[in-house]
Amino acid sequence: MAKLLWCGCLGLFCWALVPPWGFAEVVRVEIRERGAFADGCEFGRTGPYERIVGRLHFEVRPEDACNAGITDLKLAPRNAAGRVEFWSDFFLLKPLDPARGNRRLLYDVNNRGNKLALWTFNEARGNNPATLADAGNGFLMREGWSLLWCGWSGDVMPGDDRLLAGLPVARENGKPITGKIHVEICRDEPVASSPLYWTPWALSVVYPPVSLDTRRATLTMRPKRSEPATEIPPDQWAFARQEGDQRVPDAGSVWVQGGLRPGWLYELVYEGQDPRVSGLGFAAVRDGASFFRYEKTDRHETANPLANAIERAYIFGISQSGRFVNHLVYDGFNTDERQRAVFDGALSHVSGPAAACSTTGSAWPP
């Protein structure tokens, strides 16, 4: 019953369409794996499922006024046609016989490269669903849903079957771009050093500092966000990690004399370089989902595995992914280049009021 309520929420969260965006295209679908899911298990009236893994290759035109919301897009490298290229991993689960499905697509916004829909709706764990155990209770399959995931965040570290996105680095007249980077760090346990991101898991590729000289950066600490911050003197911290008894210089970590206090908020501001055009992650979701929903083939006549199989599409996200959903709708990425709605409904779960911070300069999704 709880699963049916979740599914029903997808239809209730139908949001208004937003202004159209510019030309963009899935130019090539690269299918790397295709085969039976769950050993061909029959999921009730829907029957067996198919598992398709690959990569989508995109192009966008920076000069289109409707792409102006993607920060630094005009500073990205261009191909011979004057377009910006990027790519996104994708993972698709679909009924083997489309006629037995419900003609609905559920797009699950991955969280730091990790798939969450099967965990949420099917009570299943795993980032590379392939077996019957990975289907969990089989709810979404018995109901006939097609499930799609695409990479969108350019800072995700490879490994553990995380979904990646290849986003270009912005350059100004061929030279590296530098700018201020703001990082928040909070640890649950006392540690001597920490990677430069909110969570303690090594999942993000950080923007490298221009210099490891702490006099060119600022590190503050406070017991909670409502309290005033205290600056840590530059000789009492370093860009480094603790290895045993040794302090090793590391551009991706911060070391604090006496260690980081559990639960305290540490804020680091430093000069970083080589910003990714992170807003293209929204274009990847928009154009990837639109392709699977509407198109028959890519530019090279590779067939869309969902061609003529989808009538409605919905987007779902939890926490960081929910913030992405909020931002996607607010910034106008729910209409494709042909002025068609990409998603008919959206469910943003435990996202809070924040956005994804992915269309700002030197963006680093929280």
Regions found by a protein language model. Give the residues of each.
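C-terminal His-loop and adjacent cap/lid subdomain of alpha/beta-hydrolase
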Residues: 25-366
